[in-house]
Amino acid sequence: MANNEVIENTWLERPSPEVAPELIGCTLVRRISEEKIIRSTIVETEAYAPGDPACHAYRKRTPRNTVMFGPPGISYVFLIYGMYHCLNVVTDIDGIPSVVLIRALQLESVPNWLWEHIPKQKSKPKVSRLAAGPGKLCRLLNIDLNLNGSRLRAGQPMWLEQRSPSFEKNLQIVQTTRIGITKGTNLLWRWYLANCDAVSK
């Protein structure tokens, strides 16, 4: 997977429902160390924004959700069920709680060192399903609360890159309702790459 233009904070200074579909096809780069860098394509996203009852900041600002308020271009990582981490990209202007949840990634290949993060199974799992879900991708890429509030910038533990021109030509995105929530279920704020095996559901 070739390197593309790094996404700057200014590109993210928009409401999450605008940014989320445009992140489909972009690259998430995870730098664990100088020798361990993994690149994967974002294939599924969800938006959470002000006025949305499913948004963590719907009622008020708290120590847990304060990262959601910006600035744009940082990561918001939270823990659910006491065991699964979820990675979000903070968007919009500073002070507005707006994020894009990264729901699934597509890996082109899996380096040998990455298999150590994959639970042992009777049969080798499909590469397309390794990051098919927010909890799965965080476990695979070693993303946890230590990365909450970290800057998404080249050379940092994580950053984002724009879609490649070739990917852009054949891009087909499906828009639908979000999953795994009980409020705001009518909002069409989930997007995923059509006909992609790496999508969570």
UniProtKB/Swiss-Prot annotation:
Keywords: DNA damage, DNA repair, Hydrolase. Its EC number is 3.2.2.-. GO terms for molecular function: alkylbase DNA N-glycosylase activity; DNA binding. The keyword Acetylation does not apply. One of its GO terms (biological process) is base-excision repair. InterPro entries: Formyl_transferase-like_C_sf (IPR011034), MPG (IPR003180), MPG_sf (IPR036995). It comes from the Bacteria. Belongs to the DNA glycosylase MPG family. This is Putative 3-methyladenine DNA glycosylase.
